[in-house]
Amino acid sequence: MNQYILAIDQGTTSSRAILFNQKGEIVHMAQKEFTQYFPQPGWVEHNANEIWGSVLAVIASVLSEAQVKPEQVAGIGITNQRETTVVWVKDTGNPIYNAIVWQSRQTAGICDELKAKGYDPLFREKTGLLIDAYFSGTKVKWILDHVEGARERAERGELLFGTIDTWLIWKLSGGRAHVTDYSNASRTLMFNIHTLEWDDELLAILNVPKAMLPEVRPSSEVYAKTVPHHFFGVEVPIAGAAGDQQAALFGQACFTEGMAKNTYGTGCFMLMNTGEKAVQSKHGLLTTIAWGIDGKVEYALEGSIFVAGSAIQWLRDGLRMIKTAADSEAYAEKVESTDGVYVVPAFVGLGTPYWDSEVRGAVFGLTRGTTKEHFIRATLESLAYQTKDVLAAMEADSGISLTTLRVDGGAVKNNFLMQFQSDLLAVPVERPVINETTALGAPYLAGLAVGYWNSRDDIAAQWQLERRFEPKMDDDKRTMLYDGWKKAVRAAMAFK
């Protein structure tokens, strides 16, 4: 029997290949960083061929280091940085421009024009997204506008567009499959999340030819097999794909309506499963497709926090208050409170529910008695306050009161932060044994498609709790602290 599932986790700064066994345990992992390009301030690009090379390298490393033969791999699941956009020549496989990364703001001008024409409500209704440079649609338009002859070639069917999942499936399959999954398609600003089709009206507004778009398929399905020369002489099913945050929701086994997870990475991404209904947000959230599986599509509400773990990196690298990120916990616990200090880490603006790109970071409540410990604690607490902002919006939009929050990402190792998060939300916070839930969602989706696992019940049974944090704070204190945070955010937004 094929003993392993291979996850390809293609992220913003590195590519990883991870082998999982049938218990959902990590057998071995390989990682390789690649180059970030910043051609102009605010622009972020990747070389799509370098990404492909990094993926091939980590696949080779993980198999050789784990001493696993390619024929022992039952299937491949892909999870990826979302929204990042590649346009390439169908016949040669050569990209016509660098991949424009989700973080890149180079299409902000296009977005401003679209909003000035009053298109925002139309895009929001059809795609569940805001018109923003974050999403793929304006990135495709930018490439077609700026690379000579590109739009004409696209109209003739000579060019293909894909998010990173599509690019990797196309390359692994030797160009046999030009596909994406529902979760990635729902992040493009071109896909109607209600009809589940590329939307002709939106494509016309963006001036993107339909001929270049991939076929949209379920998140758990055999799309193609690897061509032998890319997989050591073996044809292995490429059987699952999902954007990184949706993959984390799946990896956390948040399969029922109202379940939610928060990933504490560079930023924070909170997703709540809303079942088979797309809940339109009135509170600054995105409506997105969680996954398509078992013949149906399920939806999620998503909140994005731009600065989370990067605030702790700032304490370490920018202010040099700590030597390692882990030190922040010990410093925070040396004081009883922040002594009235609030840090609003709006280094690149504020995301959900404010969506204000102009606001900048601020610190409030400083006195002569403020110490380094207070400052570090206030910075950590800002992650929890921002998460509460997002959860309040989710509960208002969905009408669902959260009973438990499942967490993952680098910062969840910080016990102080997790306890404060539970106290502030007044719900238990659950940290799983396997923190690699983004990478875990992809092999689960692929494994279901090839019969490696039989059902979602099998997967839910594998989810293991490492620690549960119970709320201990009284309501009056919780209200007082959160009121102070809201006041600090208002003050920061007023200072422009």
UniProtKB/Swiss-Prot annotation:
Extract the CDD domains matched here.
FGGY_EcGK_like
Keyword entries, A-Z = ATP-binding, Glycerol metabolism, Kinase, Nucleotide-binding, Phosphoprotein, Transferase
Q: Which residues carry this modification: Phosphohistidine?
A: 230
Which reaction(s) are listed as its catalytic activity?
Answer: glycerol + ATP = sn-glycerol 3-phosphate + ADP + H(+)
What's in the GO CC field? Answer: cytosol
Q: Which residues bind sn-glycerol 3-phosphate?
A: 12, 82-83, 134, 244
Listed binding positions for ADP are: 12, 16, 266, 309, 410, 414
Q: Which residues form a coiled coil?
A: none
The GO molecular function terms of this record are:
ATP binding; glycerol kinase activity
Q: What class of enzyme is it?
A: transferase
Q: How does activity depend on temperature?
A: Thermostable up to 60 degrees Celsius.
- Activity regulation, per record: Inhibited by fructose 1,6-bisphosphate.
Sites where the protein binds glycerol: 82-83, 134, 244-245
Tell me what PTMs the record reports for this protein.
The phosphoenolpyruvate-dependent sugar phosphotransferase system (PTS), including enzyme I, and histidine-containing protein (HPr) are required for the phosphorylation, which leads to the activation of the enzyme.
Q: What does the entry report about how pH modulates activity?
A: Optimum pH is 7.5.
What EC number(s) would the UniProt record show? 2.7.1.30
Biological process annotations from GO: glycerol catabolic process; glycerol metabolic process; glycerol-3-phosphate metabolic process
Sequence positions that bind ATP: 12-14, 266, 309, 313, 410
Gene3D superfamilies under this entry?
3.30.420.40
The Swiss-Prot or TrEMBL record describes its family as follows: Belongs to the FGGY kinase family.
This chain's function reads:
Key enzyme in the regulation of glycerol uptake and metabolism. Catalyzes the phosphorylation of glycerol to yield sn-glycerol 3-phosphate.
**What name is this protein filed under?**
Glycerol kinase
Q: Which organism is it from?
A: Thermus aquaticus
